[in-house]
Amino acid sequence: MSRRAKMVLDKEFQISQIDERIYGSFIEHLGRAVYEGIYQPGHPAADENGFRQDVVQLVKELNVPIIRYPGGNFVSNFYWEDSVGPVEERPHRLELAWRSLEKNEIGLNEFSKWAKQVNSQVMMAVNLGTRGISDACNLLEYCNHPSGTKYSDLRIKHGVKDPHNIKVWCLGNEMDGPWQIGHKTMEEYGRLAEETAKAMRLIDPTIELVSCGSSNRDMPTFPDWEAVTLSHTYDYVDYISMHQYYGNRDNDSNDYLAQSDDMDDFIRTIIATCDYVKAKKRSKKTMNLSFDEWNVWFHSNAADDDITENHPWQVAPPMLEDIYNFEDALLVGLMLITLMKHADRVKMACLAQLVNVIAPIMTDAAGGAWKQTIFYPFMHASKYGRGIALQPVVSGTKHATAKHDEITDVESIAVYNEEKDEVTIFAVNRNLEEDVELTTDVRSFEGYRVLEHIVMENEDLKAVNSLTEQKVYPVKADDRTKLDGGIATSVLKKASWNVIRLGK
């Protein structure tokens, strides 16, 4: 085999403990994410609260520890008071971000109840677009204060005796974007976020706050946005956010799978900018990152534009319903590997989104729920990627791409679970033409054996799943990894996602 990669692992060579919240996700009041997604009263799978239990089971399978809510662009014109209290008294509103009609049938308290069903925390975003400090404080009081005040007592009146105790709060969403309702300049947002953070911490000093970073690395204000806004917020927030979506717009699969290298560069630039502000402020505090929107998103763009421009003000129209193919799953796997590589600084991340909207889970309003191709790498990472991210020493063959020069055939990371005495290697062979032999030195893991080698591969890079047929799914291929004398030798088939588990 002419293509080779080599990796040296040692349980003492550590990047960081992985914060399980990097396997978070996102539900926005957009398209069919909420209505006909997680919530569809009258559906055969719905419980007494209208929550689809087939969806609940799939979300539980992904084991998502935190879910961002309610947006997204939606939050910048969100009046949280409309989403609580008796459902029959809640107003219908024009939803400006996606030009839909929001009926507020599902709101803050209902979503919190659903999040408990799927064993997730809520990451709550506040509206810093059309609203500001006082409304953010009122919402926090409603959610987290026990009782005896206007908004905590209002929550109790609404049937929720115990506070929600939401710990993570996003200070707005994508405020650098001119598409955002209430878009701000760097200085405007920095000052507003600083004062909002200071006020919110007076109400609940235990919360964690996320300052808005750049909407993507191609924004003209990147990375000045981070440097300027953090000069205001650095002492008062815990994270700065990152958002990035990728797509195979040129239909060049070889170059498409190099886009995880762009993600790596994006993270490194944000880290450098945060550390510049740290140095400038002579601070001892290190700013961590919340990559709270990431995914593949491009398939549905034309259909979405048609709905917003020509068919507005619908309730839950089918928007952003990308149907993912096999190569999309490979890139999602590569993006997960990239997040794990930066576990020392990326402490939260949200696959955007979770159900129906650029999502791993899809529903049929008249039928069942099903797994998209991207479901599987996320499930594997969430299941086996908990523990300590190891710092691998890697070398190997490369191949040429159109826009990214030469890239490595194999991208990989390993996670050591000390409690279970296991190490899991995640590897993508992004060479579309040839298999690669991966040799991994695991001599520090004495007495280990091959537990399993899971693989996802398909001759058709454009293969998709549907309600009636799963063309892309993982299989066991244990014969592809041999462990002898502390050296694991694995065959990584061309264009494949691999999960290699070693343990005692």
Each model region followed by its residue ranges:
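Non-catalytic accessory regions flanking glycosidase/transglycosidase catalytic cores in CAZymes
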Residues: M1-W225, S231-Y239, M263-D264, R268-A302, ...
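Active-site His/acidic residue clusters
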Residues: H243-Q259
